[in-house]
């Protein structure tokens, strides 16, 4: 797998301010320190900032051979562990004849190692992992980027004998014992070609072509990990082995292990396992290639027929913070400050996005690595625009950047940004005993690769709660001035190659950059309302009955207006309560003629805001709170979803009340929505894949009027008033709504708020259910193959099988077995043996409403010249499964994964929310007897299940290919 861009960090020296920090490091350190003037490295090196502690819960060490390791015991998930090996190497280190081999090598790590050869001497890495429920792609994966390569084994069931030892052995082999057999290399060439085919999008081609302009004379001018297809097809075996032996070595590798483990025991095992990995003699220097400064602006403009929408990126380059200078309070403060600036500027840009005629369809700012280079940082702004709005978008980005640089931000903007930051920090602190292994792994990998600090949440929470309130707005505004220098400017514009589409010239862009300081601008005015979310509480209802010990250990409440509530308290997360409210009806209630309106209803309603607050104002009034509520219209249900911190439960109840009773009409926001939607739909037409979904929907539903394929010309037909009328109809009667709450909810605290707000929801006691809209999937065999011009010749093939099947827990489990078995079969037969695709994806859906039916979908992409052969293999393997069932090996692998996943789900709030909903919506307990059914499944069960589906004779095949030349 290729990481599209490296992981990015924020940070740099900040500006001259004095801060009194009391009780830092839990009252052990009181310090007044200076954050240096500007981003001047020479000044920064003179500053003596207090060092940050290293999280005491992680053990960090280094073996004699140079290998670094991080080991931590963590409780959750129980009996699980994460095993990572991070390498400080990537595509930047390739020689010209090796372009693409860093990524190729990553693939080869899964195709034979010393202890997992994948031949008659022993199982390979993937087959062995799957025997213990570690699924390839889900729990077993890797990525190659420009400066790093990272492999992972995740969610390993270490309570099973030998799993921990074997995972260590895999890391050991990845470090120094990948076999790189000739025949395996040749087989993998095809897989890499198909990965290139699937990823070689218009925007990637543009960026690749522009790199020499963005990085003139620098090593980063040719560094994309996919490399050269000519190299992939023809490189001699020696070239990849040379790269491997030169760069995969212990002094550039870090092992990270976090899980429900004994740290002492794992450390001892690691030392023993890696003892035979030799320290390199006279190793090649690992160079971090610099990026040159530029006095005059660099402007890179590129186009491609398959780029969706025009995009603009503006970079103001800064010197990167050396890894050795990150582990101090000054760096932590600088991260905070640049984060606040981006947050405040993003809020301004979002306001413009919501305007009636927005200058861009999206816009944001950031402080991170400069494009793809980790040796230079940059303050950046980016936006997407309408096809005819490139210059307007660019001008507006520059205008807002200059406005912020010249006038700074306001106290109210800073207060909101800081409140949101501290809320997020508090949430992480509250979850410190519930944090999962993966969160720590990501921190330690970044510490190894990039020197990012790892003080631990307790120390960070204490420090930042002292530091953040003491960094004044004046400091932020001074930093903003430093972030936008007159030199080191880079502008990248990418867009569709379309007749009549006008792009600014390089000279015009430079003129705009140089004219920033002469713009006639006024300071931003922050319009803030002091009005509360609700001026007065509604006249609440009452809880008329309460029953403890209901389904799944929930408590059932019935309110005086008919609303039914189920509350399940859990301790899985400390700072989360989830909510769902649902009622039967949904889109099915409305006639076919309203299809366009109900297709966009959710988005249209959301843009208006609630009560007296626009969407922009609502964001402001909710600053510092962890809460969200949104409504949605499904095919057969209307729903309201919410999540909050326990302390913000009343706010979630207020938002829910307003969602039912006070959707807000905002004509300007609606016009903005329409303009942005038109632009996005027009842009999407450039993407060849946009047509495959339309073709599939037409094939499935035989052009049913309720299937809406949105086109730009349809946007003006959307009826805002009708949408509001339809929405109000669905939410004017709460008497048949059932609400579910799952999470860290205190029932006695919640009950009066539930009664006050949910009990006050309108009720007219309608008795209704959903309607059958006769939207049936096409019967019989249907095939549609069509050709479409593509820059990278690709065939995309979709198979869809449908039929009747009872909605039962066993059938749901059988469908999961079937899709997982097919995934493994197709990986072996189509990806590995044929080298014909990057992956075949299988999806299944078992439906009860409006009628019971089963769907099985299979999708893959390949070389058009191979499509018929591979499609034949896909169909043949499906028929084999229907005739003979799966192999015992595949059957057992799926069982292992499903039982592991089931055990993990028991401590997930989302899992129990879904079960509560399913119990009442489907009238079925989807947990009772689950493990017994999984264990009882036989190959014959799966064979019959798939055979019963195929016998019904309903097959749709849609293929998009390229015209014959």
Question: What would you call each of these model-derived segments?
Answer:
Residues 723:
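OB-fold/S1-family RNA-binding modules
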Residues 70-72, 77-94, 100-102, 120-173, ...:
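M16 family metallopeptidases and their MPP-like homologs
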Residues 43-70, 262-350, 354-356, 415-419, ...:
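Proteolytic maturation boundary segments
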Residues 1-46:
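Bacterial Sec-dependent N-terminal signal peptides
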Residues 184-252, 256-258, 263-271, 278-288, ...:
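Hydrophobic, small-residue-rich alpha-helical packing segments that form membrane-like cores
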Residues 108-120:
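Metal-associated gating/positioning segment near the N- to mid-region
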Residues 101-109, 341, 601:
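Active-site His/Glu-centered metal-binding helix of metallohydrolases
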Residues 248, 731-732:
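Flexible, low-complexity linker/tail segments at the boundary of structured domains
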């Amino acid at each position: 797998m290729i990481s599209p861009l490296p992981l990015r960090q924020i940070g740099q020296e900040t500006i001259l301010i004095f801060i009194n920090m009391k009780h830092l490091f839990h009252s052990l350190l009181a310090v007044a320190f200076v954050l240096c003037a500007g981003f001047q490295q020479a000044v920064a090196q003179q500053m003596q900032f207090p060092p940050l502690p290293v999280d005491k819960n992680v053990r960090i060490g280094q073996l004699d051979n140079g290998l670094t390791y991080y080991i931590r015991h963590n409780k959750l998930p129980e009996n699980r562990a994460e095993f990572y090996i991070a390498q400080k190497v990537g595509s930047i280190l390739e020689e010209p004849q090796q372009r693409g081999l860093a990524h190729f090598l990553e693939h080869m790590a899964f195709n034979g190692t010393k202890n997992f050869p994948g031949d008659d001497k022993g199982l390979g890495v993937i087959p062995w992992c799957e025997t213990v429920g570690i699924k390839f792609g889900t729990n077993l994966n890797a990525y190659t980027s420009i400066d790093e390569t990272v492999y992972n084994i995740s969610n390993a069931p270490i309570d099973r004998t030998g799993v921990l030892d074997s995972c260590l052995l895999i890391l050991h082999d990845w470090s120094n014992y990948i076999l790189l057999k000739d025949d395996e290399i040749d087989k993998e060439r095809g897989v890499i070609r198909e990965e290139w085919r699937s990823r070689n999008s218009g925007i990637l081609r543009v960026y690749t072509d522009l790199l020499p302009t963005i990085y003139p004379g620098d090593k980063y001018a040719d560094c994309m990990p996919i490399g050269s297809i000519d190299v992939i097809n023809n490189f001699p075996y020696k070239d990849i082995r040379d790269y491997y032996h030169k760069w995969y070595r212990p002094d550039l590798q870090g092992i990270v292990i976090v899980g429900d483990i004994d740290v002492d025991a794992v450390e001892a095992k690691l030392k023993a396992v890696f003892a035979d990995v030799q320290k390199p003699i006279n190793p090649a220097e690992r160079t971090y290639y610099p990026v040159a400064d530029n006095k005059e602006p660099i402007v890179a403009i590129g186009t491609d027929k398959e780029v969706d929408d025009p995009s603009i990126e503006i970079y103001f380059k800064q010197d990167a913070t050396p890894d050795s200078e990150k582990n101090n309070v000054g760096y932590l403060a600088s991260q905070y400050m640049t984060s606040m600036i981006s947050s405040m500027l993003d809020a301004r840009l979002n306001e413009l996005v919501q305007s009636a005629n927005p200058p861009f369809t999206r816009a944001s700012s950031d402080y991170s690595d400069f494009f793809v280079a980790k040796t230079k940082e940059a303050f950046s702004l980016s936006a997407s625009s309408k096809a005819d709005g490139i210059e307007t978008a660019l001008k507006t980005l520059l205008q807002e950047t200059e406005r912020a640089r010249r006038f700074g931000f306001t106290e109210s903007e800073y207060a909101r940004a800081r409140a949101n930051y501290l809320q997020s920090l508090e949430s992480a602190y509250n979850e410190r005993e519930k944090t999962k292994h993966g969160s720590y792994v990501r921190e330690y990998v970044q510490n190894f690769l990039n020197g990012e600090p790892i003080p631990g949440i307790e120390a960070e929470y204490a420090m930042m709660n002292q530091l953040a309130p003491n960094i004044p707005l004046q400091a932020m505004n001074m930093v903003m001035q430093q972030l936008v220098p007159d030199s080191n400017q880079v502008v990248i514009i990418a867009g569709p190659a379309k007749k009549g589409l006008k792009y600014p010239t390089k000279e015009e862009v430079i003129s705009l950059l140089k004219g920033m300081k002469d713009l006639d601008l006024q300071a931003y005015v922050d319009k803030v309302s002091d009005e509360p979310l609700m001026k007065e509480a509604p006249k609440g209802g009452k809880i008329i009955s309460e029953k403890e010990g209901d389904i799944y250990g929930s408590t059932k409440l019935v309110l005086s207006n008919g609303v039914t509530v189920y509350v399940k308290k859990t301790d899985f997360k400390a700072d989360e309560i989830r909510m769902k409210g649902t009622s039967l009806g949904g889109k099915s209630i409305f006639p076919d003629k309203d299809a366009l309106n109900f297709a966009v209803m959710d988005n249209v309603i959301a843009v208006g805001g609630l009560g007296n607050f626009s969407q922009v104002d609502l964001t402001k009034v909710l600053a510092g709170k962890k809460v969200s509520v949104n409504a949605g219209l499904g095919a057969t249900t209307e729903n309201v979803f919410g999540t909050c911190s326990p302390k913000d439960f009343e706010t979630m109840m207020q938002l829910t009340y307003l969602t039912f009773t006070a959707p807000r009409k905002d004509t300007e926001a609606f016009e903005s929505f329409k303009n942005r939607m038109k632009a996005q739909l027009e842009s999407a037409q450039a993407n060849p894949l946009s047509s495959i979904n339309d073709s599939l929907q037409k094939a499935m539903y035989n052009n049913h009027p309720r299937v809406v394929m949105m086109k730009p010309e349809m946007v003006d037909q959307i009826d805002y008033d009708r949408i509001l009328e339809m929405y109000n109809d669905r939410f004017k009667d709460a008497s048949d709504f059932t609400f579910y709450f799952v999470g860290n909810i205190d029932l006695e605290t919640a009950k009066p708020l539930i009664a006050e707000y949910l009990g006050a929801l309108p009720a007219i006691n309608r008795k209704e259910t959903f309607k059958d809209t006769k939207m049936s999937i096409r019967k019989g065999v249907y095939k549609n193959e069509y050709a479409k011009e593509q820059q990278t010749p690709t065939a995309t093939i979709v198979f869809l099988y449908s039929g009747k099947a009872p909605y039962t827990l066993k059938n749901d489990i059988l469908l999961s077995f079937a899709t997982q078995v097919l995934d493994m079969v197709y990986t072996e037969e189509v990806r590995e043996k044929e080298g014909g695709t990057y992956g075949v994806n299988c999806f299944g859906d078992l439906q009860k409403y409006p009628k019971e039916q089963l769907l099985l979908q299979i999708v893959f992409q390949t070389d058009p010249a191979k499509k018929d052969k591979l499609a034949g293999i896909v169909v043949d393997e499906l028929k084999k499964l229907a005739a003979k069932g799966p192999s015992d090996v595949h059957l057992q692998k799926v069982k292992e994964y499903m039982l592991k996943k089931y055990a993990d789900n028991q401590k997930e709030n989302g899992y129990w929310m879904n079960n509560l909903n399913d119990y009442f919506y489907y009238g079925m307990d989807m947990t009772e007897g689950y493990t017994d059914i999984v264990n009882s499944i036989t190959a014959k069960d799966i064979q019959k299940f798939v055979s019963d589906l195929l016998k019904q004779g309903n097959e749709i095949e849609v293929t998009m290919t390229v015209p014959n030349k």
